Amino acid sequence: MSSRLSYVNVDDPNFYEFIDEKYSKYKIPPKQKTFKQFCFPSKYEFQIPQQFLAEYINPKTPYKGLLIYHRIGAGKTCTAIKIAENFKNKSKIMIVVPASLKGNFRSELRSLCADDHYLTSKERSELKILHPSSDEYKSIIKVSDDRIDKYYTIYSYNKFVDLIKQNKINLTNTLLIIDEVHNMISETGTYYESLYETIHSAPDNMRLVIMTATPIFDKPNEIALTMNLLVRNKQLPVGPDFVSTFMDIRYNSKGPVYHVKNMDLFKEFVKGYVSYYRGAPPYVFPKSELFFVRTKMSDLQKTVYQKITGKEVKQTKVRDYVNENISNNFFIGTRMISNIVYPNEKVGLKGYNSLTDEDLTIAKIREYSPKFLKILRKIKRCNGTVFVYSNFKEYGGIRVFARLLEFHRFKNYEFNGSGPRRFAIWSGDQDPIYKEEVKAVFNNKDNEFGSKIKVILGSSSIKEGVSFLRVQEVHIMEPYWNFSRMEQIIGRAIRFCSHKDVELDRQLVKVYIYLAVHPDIKMSIDERMMKMALDKKMINSAFEKALKEAAIDCELFKNANVYPGEQDIQCEQ
């Protein structure tokens, strides 16, 4: 116990001073590594934040829990492993991740992040030359998995929550690590309730590490729910109490106007429970340009839009859109019509079935979907690969756009294999092996100009854990009511070192977000959705800034978190 006496409690007035002094060797210097050192490293090295956190959450320290708010290129998974490796002979290690990322966590344990503990250097060399379907390859992976399973229990969210409900999760003397924790946060969701109760009924010798690059995905109140998993004695207010404590809302003729308040109080609540690291510096990502493409509705679109919106207005009453729950059916007909109107003026399958090949000519599509026409023309002109996204997988977006591409002499990769003018659809109901194949073909250097697959068409299943390389253009067919979703989509194409091996003038991604506008209406549904997203982004950014300033490592990592020309972070003292 004596070693713990030399540590300062998180609510001690001198806590930040203690951290800065005790861990001063982890202060990131002003001079950063170069683009080449980041993207073409000559040897494997741990990043400074990974080293610091493995020292901070450690069997010899008293610190029980932490939110690791680290962004893209920070190596969050390896950070978790570096922390866990210090506990593996002393505690149980339980990992909870989205089902789609379970394999990714095991791969990271097989990497140099965990040294040669779960895969020897000889085995690593053999895997590089063996085919993944071969018996030898599978045998090496099986042996490696057995080594991992001796120390790590890895659950998907669903499995973990099922076991909680069956009373089969025992967190005594456990290090619990939850990745992409924002997926489990919701006032009304069953995941959160089960998670909260299990964590708060766990014995004092449990430690909790939760990780996310987006601590507020939709509503500001999510950060209170997240932090309340970590803090035992001073819970943040939630729901309407959170709003009244930390936000001012005024209403004028244009709708609500939002401001934050009591940020010092908010920082007091989260003090000692947040680590913030921006991740890789801006110069290792491709540059990006964002364009809002305001597309005037056709006469037919205007007529159908007014008819549908008249019905939907009666069903939809959302006043405070930053804090209220919004259903996926929010103005769904109006939103689909803003993308495409069908010849029989119906929406959904009935509308789609009325669309014939003659309706896909340039002259006709100009009347049915000015948006689609603009996207089609940009794809044809683009000298490289393109990622097209819609929230609508079927009749208001991807499915019908695929038909348009086929009519204009593009071919579906699934049925025609690779070649020029190919597109591939990426959706949740496809075989994971097929998606891996698409990604491998698309991301190969020899596809830089789209000679194998030019266009990826994606819907909401593409949000997490997917990287596309060397993309030149991203087209988002319609806005969504939170900007995190749009940033997540854009982030599929703007990746850490994703354009490292292309010419300098091609290290740029042009991002287009399409808004259908109605000349006789002050604000169309697309414009309204965009305003909602930007208002939320502004208010959420204020809470995120407070998290950054209250982070335990604010001073240590400041040189890597703020770059010239950016808004400064004032670290708490």
From Swiss-Prot:
Q: Where is this motif: DEAH box?
A: 179-182
Q: Which residues form the Helicase C-terminal domain?
A: 374-551
UniProt enzyme class: hydrolase
Q: Does the keyword Zinc apply?
A: no
Enzyme nomenclature, EC number = 3.6.4.13
Binding residue positions for ATP: H70, R71, I72, G73, A74, G75, K76, T77
Chief subcellular location: virion
Domain called Helicase ATP-binding: residue spans: 57-233
Supply the InterPro entries for this chain: Helicase/UvrB_N (IPR006935), Helicase_ATP-bd (IPR014001), Helicase_C-like (IPR001650), P-loop_NTPase (IPR027417)
Pfam families in UniProt: Helicase_C (PF00271), ResIII (PF04851)
Q: Tell me the Gene3D superfamilies matching this sequence.
A: P-loop containing nucleotide triphosphate hydrolases (3.40.50.300)
Q: Which reaction does it catalyse?
A: ATP + H2O = ADP + phosphate + H(+)
One GO molecular function term? DNA binding
| Compartmental location | Virion
User: What's the name of the protein?
Assistant: Putative ATP-dependent RNA helicase R563
Q: Which GO terms describe its biological process?
A: DNA repair; replication fork processing
Q: Which UniProt keywords apply?
A: ATP-binding, Helicase, Hydrolase, Nucleotide-binding, Virion
Example of a GO cellular component annotation carried by this entry:
virion component
The family assignment reads: Belongs to the DEAD box helicase family. DEAH subfamily.
